[in-house]
Amino acid sequence: MREIVHIQGGQCGNQIGAKFWEVVSDEHGVDPTGTYHGDSDLQLERINVYFNEATGGRYVPRAILMDLEPGTMDSVRSGPYGQIFRPDNFVFGQTGAGNNWAKGHYTEGAELIDSVLDVVRKEAESCDCLQGFQVCHSLGGGTGSGMGTLLISKIREEYPDRMMLTFSVVPSPKVSDTVVEPYNATLSVHQLVENADECMVLDNEALYDICFRTLKLTTPTFGDLNHLISAVMSGITCCLRFPGQLNADLRKLAVNLIPFPRLHFFMVGFTPLTSRGSQQYRALTVPELTQQMWDAKNMMCAADPRHGRYLTASALFRGRMSTKEVDEQMLNVQNKNSSYFVEWIPNNVKSSVCDIPPKGLKMSATFIGNSTAIQEMFKRVSEQFTAMFRRKAFLHWYTGEGMDEMEFTEAESNMNDLVSEYQQYQDASAEEEGEFEGEEEEA
């Protein structure tokens, strides 16, 4: 019941995805060969959300791995859980997208997309009641962003009523891998606004900060960063996979988090984050989890929630705890910091409690917030985009693949509209119904 098909694209997506499958397999007691070695029936009860049972009792992830070059997939295949995936579900080209969104979306990616869709169909058909798709990708490169958004729009056509959840790694403010990141990211956001239901926004810099500040790692690797992301990914779907007192699924999340269809870009966080040495000295309480959960330093994308207001938020707790205490703490947060929540959506924090904590912890919490502060991130990318686009820098790489300049202009204005929508709702108050007309001009 309620299966989720997982798709990972490009180098970033495949590396995050590989880490995620290590975490989920571990939670369900599945070893790298796909054999169950768990100790509790609860691990098996809804294992089919993410796994397919194959012959001989082997569990195979409902995962589709795609890339336009074979490199990253080879390293996934030779990694710790590389042998658990279905070999047919590796779909790759040989050319690479070369960090070019147009190659991923229009030329190289378009040639490969049909073979990916065949695998998607095959996975969807083996589901009893498909809940939706989750896509891991980055927005700065070529494959994850260009081909990832192409795949999302194709799946949207074929499965219009299923949830589409993305984990999108956006370019960081200070750390840049590629000069053309602002182009790729803007073109991708243009697609995600229209075709995705929920986007969890992540970025490397915020993740590095968490590793430095909170986890006290002196030299964080991408492995450490991806571990943080996979903790959130596992937290978001734990209600589907384990019994709980207050359940949440992808659709409930969407209904509670998205007040307006375009505003579906969320900040995420996870607690407890403690440095490796100090774990055993801390007994966690619900107030402590709540405290860390709402902490701005805990957000995995480079936007400061204190610069905006929360439209809605969702807290997913895991472990044995009293639901009464959870509710009290959530109310407490809203009452004490009421200026950071919009007053025209009363009680805008949803909470859910799942009984089974993640490996090695007594309790944990995952946070998803829909805050107007996320406009900072879009603004930043948009400014970098405009600076380059005004001079038409690097544009020939895109037009050479058949793109038109108009597409860039459209993507740019769509992104700017998104920013002003967030701004409009940040400034709106509950009383001023008739004043909206004047407000929009100012935004």
From Swiss-Prot:
Pfam families: Tubulin, Tubulin_C
Species of provenance: Chlamydomonas incerta
Cofactor(s) in the UniProt record: Mg(2+)
Key word Transmembrane helix present: no
Family: Belongs to the tubulin family.
GO biological process, one term: microtubule-based process
Residue numbers binding Mg(2+): 69
Region ranges (Disordered): 424-443
Name the UniProt record assigns to this protein: Tubulin beta chain
